[in-house]
Amino acid sequence: MNESNEALEAAILYAKKFLEDLLSFFGVNLDVYATRDDEVIQLSVPSTQLNGFLIGQRGENMRSLQYLVSTALKNNGYEYTRVNVDVADYKRHRADRLATTAEEWIKKVKDSGEPMELKPMNAADRRIVHQVASDAGLTTESVGEGRDRHIILKPAAE
């Protein structure tokens, strides 16, 4: 195993243990499933009776857990600090639902020939919409700042 892989494996083990310890403060004692996707540490928390609490409104608590793990990695000198935390496959299910909704928006734009301005969404959701729209041949543009950042779907230029 080369030095880079060893550093990533060490970061994965640290992140897994840190999240398990953090969850234990909430009375959740379980084994977090840890993998890697390129240089992103993927941490999957199995379903528990506290799913709603751990996920939070629109995934806010889950993003906070992700931030805490990433910050702990940085503060402890790990080179790899990009982390994705998913509780009970929430992100995967949300991405699937969002892709289906995006396909409906795309159909409306194609049928009307008019651009459609979407409501503000987080960066992860915008990435999904950009990808689905690109695959369907539409042009997208992100506009706004911070929590007001949103996408404009545009018909493809003829």
Which ranges hold each PLM region?
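RNA-contacting regions in translation and RNA-metabolism proteins
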Residues: 1-158
